[in-house]
Amino acid sequence: MTESVLDYMTRLGRAAREASRVIGRASTAQKNRALQAAADALDAARAELAAANELDLAAGRASGLEPALLDRLALTPARIDGMITGLRQVASLPDPVGAIRDMSYRPSGIQVGKMRTPLGVIGIIYESRPNVTIDAASLCLKSGNATILRGGSEAIHSNRAIATCIQRGLAEAGLPAAVVQVVETTDREAVGALISMPEFVDVIVPRGGRGLIERISRDARVPVIKHLDGICHIYVSQHADLDKAWNVAFNAKTYRYGICGAMETLLVDQQVAERFLPEMARRFVEKGVELRGCERTQAIISAKPATEADWHTEYLDAILSIRVVDGLNQAIDHINHYGSHHTDSIISEHQGEARQFMAEVDSASVMLNTPTCFADGFEYGLGAEIGISTDKLHARGPVGLEGLTCEKYVVIGDGQLRGQGSC
């Protein structure tokens, strides 16, 4: 009899839960050995990876997949090199598991502190890019978690081939293959099952378009680590160094249009707008960026009228909204109303103004004189990241190894007894 999707996912979940107990107590050396061996396996399997990837690319071309998506799907030699390097880099990162902090003596004589422990089983749901399989698997493995990976159906052959290499690495280190499992059915029912198994899955991390993430957030019966949009702002204050502001704003928008940390709205203090905007517009127009502005912006530079929808939009493209504001308070109000709580930056040489901005802007990352595109795990010194969270529970900002662990209390005594009057 053919196994149902629910039965299949239950089998994966049960195997992952059992494997999580093994990887959770594995030594740092054993986990690093698995990562290095997986990197070696990827290097040795380049032909297999290319063949599997070509199956996905051929299917994508036949189904009319857009060129940009085909590009994201492709496993070029350089991208395989990047995956190998990524595995080795994660192996070199400090292991957060077992770290104890804040040990202190209480008046009773007991010591109390906190220990980092794995979350358990992490479900990752993502689209298109097969290299996410490596990013997610390596971070979960190093942080002592088992993972169930559900990639996009367009990358099914590539993801299977990559998972096989990772499982070879696990076997070489004496760890169970179920530490990293790829969902091998393209049936969408598998996603519904994965997000509805709290007995087997401890947290879900969705990576993809807004529709996917909204659906997961709405329907999941387990906690979700996510961000919906990257509507990032830069505010150029009246106390800005304009040379610095031109360079920072230009980099924030044009470094890469398609990343969640790209600036989407530029806010400019009215006191500097007439000096700042003409040169800023010249640079953006020369780069091919379409400008959309408020009425005060349009009175200074040539720009299309910005609509209410523009302030809510993550373009992920060469389009920028510009608004002239009365001052710092209006800039903060705009960001907190229209922003996505991702990353926002102020350009200013005034320390008090910068402190107010950082205290009052409700975002996962707040910056001073820094392009928003620096919102990245590697740039923050976290190593690789599994994503960026705009939630306030459990992790906020780039989620690296430590974000894939939690803390439990450690209490050490020497036979102390609690007295009746201490309750």
Curated annotation (Swiss-Prot):
CDD domains according to UniProt: ALDH_F18-19_ProA-GPR (cd07079)
Compartment(s) where it occurs, according to its Swiss-Prot or TrEMBL record: Cytoplasm
Top-level EC class as recorded in UniProt: oxidoreductase
One Pfam family, short name: Aldedh
Catalytic activity: L-glutamate 5-semialdehyde + phosphate + NADP(+) = L-glutamyl 5-phosphate + NADPH + H(+)
Main location: cytoplasm
Keywords linked to the UniProt accession: Amino-acid biosynthesis, Cytoplasm, NADP, Oxidoreductase, Proline biosynthesis
GO cellular component terms, A-Z: cytoplasm
Matches recorded under HAMAP family: ProA
Protein family membership: Belongs to the gamma-glutamyl phosphate reductase family.
Role played: Catalyzes the NADPH-dependent reduction of L-glutamate 5-phosphate into L-glutamate 5-semialdehyde and phosphate. The product spontaneously undergoes cyclization to form 1-pyrroline-5-carboxylate.
Name of the protein: Gamma-glutamyl phosphate reductase
Organism: Pseudomonas putida (strain ATCC 700007 / DSM 6899 / JCM 31910 / BCRC 17059 / LMG 24140 / F1)
